[in-house]
Amino acid sequence: MKIENNKVVVDTYAWIEYFNGTEKGEKVKKFLIEEYTYTPEIVLAEIARKYIREGASLETVKQRLRIIGELSVTVGIDYKIALESGKAYLELLDHSKKLKLKAKPGLGDAIILATAKVLNAKVLTGDQHFKKIKITIWIGE
């Protein structure tokens, strides 16, 4: 049974693990079944880019995007999320420097974090930019 207070934003990393059927993907599946899950629309674009770049058929890409829409609520960018994204980017940038990560966070990462904050949710991910952030449910290494 889903508990309304248990809101989870599923990021690109988590969806890829889910579609790959990995052990981490099994953890994601559990959240999709047991929690109220949300996916920022930017994640749909990132998923499409990844699979198209890897040569997946458009039908496969469409099917995966439909699955995301069936298993979670997709969330667009409104003014609250846009404003929060600006703050979230700076937070992630500072956090990445503390973790001594080579890659800077992207705008997509900021939108994902902002969406979680606006929804008062946690972020389900294994993306290094989110590691050790308070609202992260970590499924990475």
Model segments located where?
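Histidine- and aromatic-rich ligand-binding microenvironments
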Residues: 10-11, 39-40, 105-106, 127, ...
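Active-site neighborhoods of divalent-metal-dependent phosphate/nucleic-acid chemistry enzymes
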Residues: 74-122
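Short active-site oxyanion
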Residues: 5-6, 34-37, 70-73, 117-122
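Short, well-structured N-terminal submotif of metal-dependent ribonuclease cores
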Residues: 1-40, 50-66
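Short, hinge-like loop/turn segments at secondary-structure boundaries
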Residues: 54-58, 92-93, 140-141
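Acidic, PIN/NYN-like endoribonuclease modules and their adjacent C-terminal/linker elements
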Residues: 1-3, 113, 117-141
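A generic structural signal for short hydrophobic patches within well-formed alpha-helices
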Residues: 15-16, 44, 82, 130-131
